[in-house]
Swiss-Prot record:
A cellular component term, taken from the record's GO annotations: nucleus
Protein name per its UniProtKB record: Origin recognition complex subunit 5
Molecular functions per Gene Ontology: ATP binding; ATP hydrolysis activity; DNA replication origin binding; ribonucleoprotein complex binding
GO biological process, one term: mitotic chromosome condensation
Keyword ATP-binding: yes
Keyword ATP-binding: yes
Intracellular or extracellular location(s): Nucleus
Organism: Drosophila melanogaster
Family: Belongs to the ORC5 family.
Record InterPro entries: AAA+_ATPase, AAA_16, ORC5, ORC5_C, ORC5_lid, P-loop_NTPase
Protein origin, superkingdom: Eukaryota
CDD domains according to UniProt: AAA
Function of the molecule: Component of the origin recognition complex (ORC) that binds origins of replication. DNA-binding is ATP-dependent, however specific DNA sequences that define origins of replication have not been identified so far. ORC is required to assemble the pre-replication complex necessary to initiate DNA replication.
Pfam family, one: AAA_16
Amino acid sequence: MEAICSSLEPLFPCREAAIETLGELIGDSSETYPSAIYLFGHSGTGKTALTRAFLKECGKRQNVRTAHLNAIECYTTKIMLEILLDSLAPDQGDALKVDNMLDFVEQLRRQAATRVEDQGFLIAVDNAERLRDMDANVLPVLLRLQELTNLNLCVILLSQLPFEKFYNKTGLSEIVCLHLAQYNKAETQRILGSDFQQVRNQLLEQFAQDKKRLEICQEAVTEDFYNNYLNLFLSVFYKACRDVPELQLTARKCLSTYLEPVLDGTVDATDISRLWRHIAGPLRSALTQIYMRIEKPAEEVEDFTAIEDQSVRKLAQSLELPYYAKFLLIAAFLASHNAAKQDKRLFVKHHGKQRKRMQTVNARAKTTEKMSTTLGPKSFSIDRLLAIFYAILEEKVGLTCNLLSQISTLVHLNLLSFVSGEQNIMEGSARLQCTIGLEFVLQIGKVVGFNVRQYLCDFM
């Protein structure tokens, strides 16, 4: 098992502790496995990739049969059981047919009678929360499968939810829980920086026909240059998105824009401040389109900003949200980009006179770099979100379950994201932030007839 863990650690940086814990829990096939392991964490934390690689190495180096499936693909219990049996008992071929959990357990018991000594079985189920929608006995049986089949078998469940969400009235067997926390900023930069050589080779291939640019690229694109770029990139993106695959994809897209003035010879590769001024606008435009996969036409690359804005407008106009959800989205944007101390002046009609002071006048003379709409979103509480929502909505609406469910819909669509307290929504300690940009919310405002700029401190 030590050899397996050692081979996986270079492939999954910053996950050494999780790999070591998983190795200690599983051990060798000659040792007794735990009956079930629950691996959970947010998307982009490496659950699926790590488990798949771990099972693959166990299958190669040990006397273990493995099965890995995605519960989303299994729309019936029968399909899921047949996929599992096909992986765990490949010698049987088409003879294996199961209709329910009882048949599945019986087939595995037959495997116990014919299995090789010290043979182990590992089953991994991705998106395990979907098991709750299947037959009522599926999840309890999977958790006790080792006991029922008399096999050295372990079921690894993968999900984004904590295991408390799985409990029902009849109860479930105890399970070993392993949490994969989100990467911090330094870890994210280390992971993104680990593919430097691959990114550099792609750039060299891209400029292979242009000798002048190829020479500049070979000299300028060093590991320090790439790390400086990632540092600037994460200063914009890290608060809004911590999904590593998504960040990796967006970072590669924006690198060519960052490199452009260096290739033209107008900016030195070590002049980070000028490179930041060049890349700041495109990075903020890309931030409004993260997860959306909006591509620029190749023939219009030069008109970068105009194309991005046009794509955002089209997306905002075609976004089919309920009427109140659009106002909730506007309220979330206002809460993310206005200071809480300004709420009374912005949303209360009779807030009293405000004296003009020189300090206030100077503070309002903001440059583009200091405007809150370009600095990125700030977190806010649900109480503040609802207070702004009721302030900007002309009609009176009761606080119903339907209204609160629309907040979770916006989170599911990645228009809002949780910063903290995701499990404590009803207690009021949860904090969110708005992930959309100014151009997007202005178009939403036009659809519902609301002037967003009028309620933004940056434009007052």
